[in-house]
Amino acid sequence: AALAAYRASLAIRETLARRDPANTEWQRDLSISHEKIGNVLLVQGNGPAALTAYRKSLASRETLARRDPGNAQWQVDLAVSCYKLGTTSALPVAERRAFLLRGRDILKQIKAAGRLAPAQDWIGEFDAELAKLPAAN
């Protein structure tokens, strides 16, 4: 039921985003819909489909972050996408590590600039996930 609801929401958000591509909030909402669909698919055991949804979310967030690099929320959203991909076992370890490092670096940069909200300081979570990965060869 949740997946069907998220897909219905995605269809609406896709329509809105197409109507006004300059509306960054609608673009962000679209990325959130893809992420939520990925979350449900992952729980259902469909890693490859979750990966596809997470990649779509990442693509939207990369576009927003490029469009307005000074927007801390877009950067945090991008870090979240990196975390989702970095913790998805459907990816090879090297790719997971690269996503986790990228996301952690994004958060560190925002924090160093004094723009990371304490509630969004997930650098420790990135470090914990990196520590779980097998050592790089």
Regions found by a protein language model. Give the residues of each.
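Long, intrinsically disordered low-complexity tandem-repeat regions enriched in serine/threonine/proline
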Residues: A1-A4, A8-I12, Q73
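Ser/Thr/Pro-rich low-complexity tandem-repeat tracts
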Residues: S9-I12, S33, S57, S81
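Flexible helix-coil transition and linker loops at the boundaries of alpha-helical arrays
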Residues: E14-Q27, E62-Q75, Q109-P118
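Terminal, low-structured helical/coil segments at or just beyond the last alpha-helical repeat
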Residues: L101-N137
